[in-house]
Regions:
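Flexible coil/turn residues that form the inter-helical turn or adjacent wing/linker of helix-turn-helix
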Residues: 10, 85, 100
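N-terminal cationic leader/targeting segments used for protein routing and processing
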Residues: 4-7, 32, 95, 99, ...
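Short intrinsically disordered terminal tails
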Residues: 1-9, 77-83, 151-155
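Short conserved AdoMet
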Residues: 22-23, 97
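Acidic, low-complexity, intrinsically disordered interaction modules
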Residues: 26-83, 101-149
């Protein structure tokens, strides 16, 4: 598939993913559970990004969910994705989806405009217009994934 095709999905590094859920100063806003194959490691008390959690930065996130105050991610090893890069809305939401459906609400916000999507959110519907927007930060609140984006625009 051509790199300019808007529907192409790109891998998301764990380091870039976790940073979206941090306070911007190096502390993750959630406890973190990382599952890698048959191994699960946990980081409690809202870990610092520079601590042991950084050992997993270059792993690729294959799926994610939020459970209470835990950010739970499944990862796989990646030898080709060692550079940090921006995370697009579409790539982030694909990690949380179950066969293209999200069982929570989504709010996209660029501080000037807001786009809300109520449960169930189908990734192939209206929200797909915003898939190429670049994420700045995220947080989970009352069953809604709130995503701040650099600029809210439609593809």
């Amino acid at each position: 598939m051509d790199k300019d095709t808007k529907t192409e999905s790109y891998p998301v590094r764990l380091g870039d993913f976790i940073y979206l859920f941090s306070d911007g100063y190096g502390r993750v806003n959630y406890n973190v559970e990382i599952t890698y194959g048959d191994t699960t490691v946990t980081f409690e008390d809202f870990p610092e990004l520079s601590e042991e959690i950084s050992n997993y930065d270059n792993c690729i996130v294959t799926s994610a969910h939020v459970d209470d105050c835990w950010l739970c991610v499944h990862v796989e090893d990646s030898k080709y994705c060692s550079e940090s890069h921006s995370v697009r809305v579409g790539d982030l939401l694909n990690l949380f989806s179950n066969k293209g459906i999200l069982n929570f609400s989504v709010e996209l916000n660029d501080f000037d405009a807001i786009a809300d999507f109520e449960v169930p959110v189908e990734l192939s519907k209206y929200i797909s217009r915003y898939f190429d927007c670049v994420c700045r930060s995220c947080y989970w609140e009352d069953g809604c994934l709130c995503i701040f984006v650099k600029e809210l625009y439609e593809n």
